[in-house]
Structures are given as structure tokens and as C-alpha cells.
Amino acid sequence: MEGDFVLRSGKRSKYYLDKYLFETCPDILKALGKEFARHVSDDVTLIGGAELGGVALAAAAAMESGRNWVIIRNSKKGYGTGKMVEGVLKPGDVVLLVEDIATTGGQVLEAAKIITEAGATVKKIVCVIDRKQGAEENIVGAGYKFEAILTKNDLGIKDRL
């Protein structure tokens, strides 16, 4: 979609990739679950996804791989348990962290920090679409492996920023 958009990172963009179009379509979500499951090695014990965009993706990957999954919150809630991680994350767990669209990698790096602070390890971060605006460099620079199922180039999006 073309226009003038402000992204979560705070950056402005001339195009918008609507993640909800692929996250709310069962056939596409199932296919993405299979793609994510290809990254689940024997040592991976959990799938992780940050709210909101990573939740459906982590569930799809978990169903395809047979691994349990956790939701990493963006912030503590003032009600209920107030936990940052929903589901069971234990010290020593090895997590495949999935992401919808990566721009700078900020949200997924915040989620990775929460996982590591809990005593678990992030094996790899995999996103559906890399906008090619610094996410890979930031994620790899922070010491994590990173892969994208698709990039903006695969979608035929030219630089417009």
C-alpha cells in the first residue's frame, strides 16, 4: 500500500506492508508456520513471538513443529499476573523467535532481551518480511542469527525512503 506512513520504529515510509493481511488468512498462516518450522533444529525447545504481530506466527510455527510457544509482551500489564512472558519459559530453553515485519529490529530485540534475561537462549530470529532498513544489521550486531523468509526486494518494492 502506498502513501505516507509512520512505522513502529518511528521512521516514515512511502509504503506500508499490512501484516494483518497475511496473519489473518489461514492458508497463508499455515504456509508461514511451515516456513518457520524449517528453522526449528533439534535443540530448539520453544517458539517465541512478540505481541501483537508475532503471536499468530508463533502459534502457527508451534503447531507445525510440535513445540510449545510463548508470547513476549511489549510491556507489563497492570492486571492479572503482570508477567512479560506468557506461557512457560524456563532457564536453559532454546528459543526460535519469530517476527512479522522487521524494519530496525527494535521490537524483536526487546523480546530477545526479555528471553535472555529469563535465562533462556535465542537460537535465531526469523521474520516474514525484512524491509531492509537496518534490522539485519542491528540483530546480527546484537549477537543473534537472523533470517527473513522474504525481503522487500522479493516483493518488488523499490527504495522510496
Model-derived features: where do they sit?
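Short glycine-rich phosphate-binding loop at a beta-alpha junction
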Residues: 43-53, 124-127
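PRPP-dependent phosphoribosyltransferase catalytic core
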Residues: 114-161
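Active-site-facing substrate-recognition patch
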Residues: 1-42
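Phosphate/pyrophosphate-binding loops at sites that engage ATP/ADP/AMP, CoA/4′-phosphopantetheine
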Residues: 36-45, 112-118
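A short, small-residue-rich loop immediately preceding and capping a beta-strand
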Residues: 44-50, 93-100
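Solvent-exposed alpha-helices and their adjacent loops that cap or buttress functional pockets
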Residues: 40, 87-91, 117-119, 138-139
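Short, glycine/charge-rich flexible loops or terminal/linker lids adjacent to PRPP-binding catalytic cores
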Residues: 59-96, 104-109
